[in-house]
């Protein structure tokens, strides 16, 4: 939650919203007002109107990054609930173009984004070389019966062994889990 308080925006893919219905707010005592903009990459606007994110959009901003394939009626319904819907370029396979999405976020003053979930989003950002810092928290298994590995089949060693990243500080042991931070080599 402290990481959330230190960034401009939290980014998740719509699959995370559909699976977990997260709040994506900072829930540390006395820091609720530090909750960043909550950003969802959702090419077809499949986020449920009854999701926690949409329901709380007037309290903590929610921006949905979508494509021209999105249903205009759903766009209007989301906007009526206080959600900012931002159209981005689409990739050849119909997903939100990550470079365009980050450029549109930057146009709105967002420069520090925490990509919190899910596995497909993490993998796409790493493969597109759009990660400046990685905080890896590894647990001894997947979460839930349909759980995915942290980066949807892209091994964590992709970052650990990459010449593009170096570890910052020591690996921390947190019970059976471990946490390590990596930064891009400039």
Explain the meaning of each model-derived region.
Residues 1-186:
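Enzymes that bind and transform nitrogen-containing heteroaromatic metabolites
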